């Protein structure tokens, strides 16, 4: 049974049940979709293209100038430019996208998720232009996409709602009064869109105005609509959503629920299906409520009804309905063995749903972990950079949805998600084992990611037993985040880094030896002395020094220099010493296998090691993956010396520090607001600038009271990560 279920999952796209238990009506083959334009980018565009190709349907990609060489462009049958990088001029330009579809001869447009996927105006424009919109009717998008309107509809239908304000009057004084009526803390949320963009938790009236205005700006930038709703903030909630599907013959069913409680910045980072620790009766209630919600607006195609579950009272409340395919839809596909994109196309073609409710299977358990380019230590701020090394694990029960390849750049213009790692197991425990193993094998070098943090989440004892809620990260922050004041943790971190630094040294030198042994350099004096007569000098214990700079997350983002002395032994082993009192000499045997792979023996343990290296700005950047550990080191180029070589320069990696009061950009981004003028007096914590990157705003505040100096930025300027923005001085 399990093997059959696994076969169904791994061939989602090859074999599907076709039991027509629902009313079907008449459908004509004369208008079947043969060519689809995918109005999106990244992993979801690649995902849609993959299913379309299997069905024999041609695909058209659209791209901005920033995405000309992207994977979603390369995988489509053809691609059409729609504008410059800013989303409002390209992926949010509905007229340009419809024009591209007509020019390409496509009969249908698939919006993916985000961008125009929940725009009723865009769905209507498609239909008016003679194009099939692969999604719900514009009326349902309008009713349910507007979170205030959807709550009014659900309230009228008797669905429980969280206390809040969902009215049309957006006057800020009115909103302040409503917030007072609801009672703090309140949740500020845009009425359109999703993904946590624009959401703010406000704890006191003093914070309200600034948070409200920032939420409006983010909503306008992300969704083109800046209206806001208010809700009472439930202190211990779970986020559980139900996947629903309808067809144009009046049939609606659900495909069970997903738990999306583990979030940061109000964005999901680990999702799972089915939800853990709920009863069959509770599951049934959720399903019935979700189907009723969909039927209330004559819904068809894919949708998700989101509920907030109060873990104190065990009551659930309607939160919102997403009228599109969700980012996390793969976990549902894994437990029901169906391709939801194929279902979307079937429904768009006028066909009935391929299964009835009683035929929908529920097999095993699935997790999805979202891999983001972000700085966890900086509060999960988005990061940019080049994927110099990118290796993902894939197997019969492990699936990776991605829109990038090695060498691609993650830019500031779009969402920083690199990939979705999806795993399946026969039960939750088995799936969790695969999730932890796959995360340990997920390799990215070139920019910071949240992979290490996801590993901490997956390995946490509370997560293992399914004790999840939306405050999971805050509740267990002492376990999940580093504490520079914890001497035990600091020592453990240093010892792990020291071990991996030693393995790095042995692996890099062994690879050089391997290459030079097969390509003798002819005694070049430019090479280290122990390679002047390959393989090595007989009876000469050549030594080599290396200095590696380790990014020490246990030291508040500071780095630590590790000075290594490597001695080659006649038996092919390396003795590696670290210049620190009490550090033992480590004996390492390294065997180069191929590419980035090594087989290493150290401290009585033999295991596989992966080392990725790239050079930039006269620095060699080195990443090592060993077991569940990943470490990142930097080395100045040209600093490797043999003991026999004379050098006037002692190896040294410089680190720069800015003067006290200097404020640097926490991320690469766009200046969207300058709140004070240069040489103005500010108070500690006063907002000075607002930066935007990947549709998220970040307020830059004064670090102390004083006068602003060096503030020369203007709205519309781009700043790089770490660049100096201004300083605050006493005078």
Curated annotation (Swiss-Prot):
Residues that bind Mn(2+) 2: 320, 322
Where does the transit peptide lie?
1-22
Question: Where are the N6-biotinyllysine modifications?
Answer: 695
Q: Which reaction does it catalyse?
A: 3-methylbut-2-enoyl-CoA + hydrogencarbonate + ATP = 3-methyl-(2E)-glutaconyl-CoA + ADP + phosphate + H(+)
| Keyword terms of this UniProt record | ATP-binding, Biotin, Ligase, Manganese, Metal-binding, Mitochondrion, Nucleotide-binding, Transit peptide
The protein's matches in SUPFAM superfamilies, at most eight in alphabetical order, are given as:
Glutathione synthetase ATP-binding domain-like, PreATP-grasp domain, Rudiment single hybrid motif, Single hybrid motif
Name its co-factor(s).
biotin; Mn(2+)
Tissue specificity, please? In leaves, cotyledons and stems.
Q: Name one GO cellular component term.
A: mitochondrion
Please list the GO biological process terms of this entry. Answer: L-leucine catabolic process
Q: What does this protein do?
A: Biotin-attachment subunit of the 3-methylcrotonyl-CoA carboxylase, an enzyme that catalyzes the conversion of 3-methylcrotonyl-CoA to 3-methylglutaconyl-CoA, a critical step for leucine and isovaleric acid catabolism.
The molecule here is called Methylcrotonoyl-CoA carboxylase subunit alpha, mitochondrial
Which species is listed as the source?
Glycine max (Soybean)
